[in-house]
């Protein structure tokens, strides 16, 4: 989907990369709409004129955060050729995708709103989204063919599954505002990204598996893939 990668705070030596990292931190702290080019320049330790040398406008910086960081698609390429049932691969993908969204510097819903308004500028965003959607469809169809999943509409499952991940990201990003003891009228227990990722994968598999008892086996198999937790 071209979803953004969590930005590290260590300078890379490249002004362009440092601008993207600084912007990513500001986007997650304040929200995309509230960040100005001046803010980004200051955070990156640059004069605004130097910032414009690398990026003419804020939208291009945001585009860079996902055009060079196609994290779920890289993950798909990594696990696609490996052994394992379609259901196991889908479990791992949902778990990984939820984790990387929770750790992302940008709100995926903000990205989508921006991309909707400027489809030409963000064509790559939608191309990535289509590839991710299609891969989920393929896995669901294969799991149905093998008798692992109940009969269902793979396209509808893909839309619902990816939307579920994105909804979890939204709640994760705002949970500090709703902890017990805050002024919010709505409070809930905060959850870690890994806990939410496991919950998302388990919930989706429980709804799809023809034999719900297979979930425990899938979870045991997925536990062997510790590399899934490294969002790089």
What are these regions (language model features)?
Residues 1, 130-145, 170-232:
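C-terminal peripheral helix-coil segments that are non-catalytic and often amphipathic
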Residues 29-33, 83, 104, 146-147:
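Short coil/turn segments at alpha/beta junctions that flank glycine-rich nucleotide-binding fingerprints
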Residues 98-137, 146-149, 155-156:
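Short secondary-structure transition hinges
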Residues 18, 22, 26-64:
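Helix-turn-helix
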């Amino acid at each position: 989907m071209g979803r953004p990668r969590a930005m590290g705070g260590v300078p890379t030596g490249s002004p362009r990369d440092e601008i993207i990292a600084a912007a990513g931190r500001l986007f997650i702290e304040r929200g995309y709409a509230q960040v100005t080019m001046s803010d980004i320049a200051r955070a990156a330790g640059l004069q605004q004129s130097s910032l414009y040398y690398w990026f003419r406008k804020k939208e291009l910086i945001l585009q860079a955060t996902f055009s060079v960081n196609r994290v779920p698609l890289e993950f798909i390429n990594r696990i696609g050729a490996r052994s394992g049932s379609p259901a196991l691969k889908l479990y791992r993908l949902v778990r990984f995708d939820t984790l990387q969204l929770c750790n992302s510097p940008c709100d995926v819903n903000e990205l989508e709103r921006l991309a909707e308004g400027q489809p030409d500028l963000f064509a790559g965003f939608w191309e990535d989204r289509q590839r991710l959607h299609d891969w989920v469809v393929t896995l669901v169809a294969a799991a149905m063919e093998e008798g692992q999943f109940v009969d269902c509409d793979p396209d509808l499952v893909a839309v619902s599954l990816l939307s579920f991940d994105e909804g979890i990201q939204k709640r994760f990003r705002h949970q500090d505002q709703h902890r017990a003891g805050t002024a919010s009228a709505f409070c809930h227990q905060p959850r870690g990204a890994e806990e939410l990722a496991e919950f998302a994968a388990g919930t989706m598999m429980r709804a799809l598996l023809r034999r719900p008892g297979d979930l425990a086996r899938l979870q045991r198999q997925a536990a062997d893939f510790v590399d899934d937790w490294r969002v790089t």
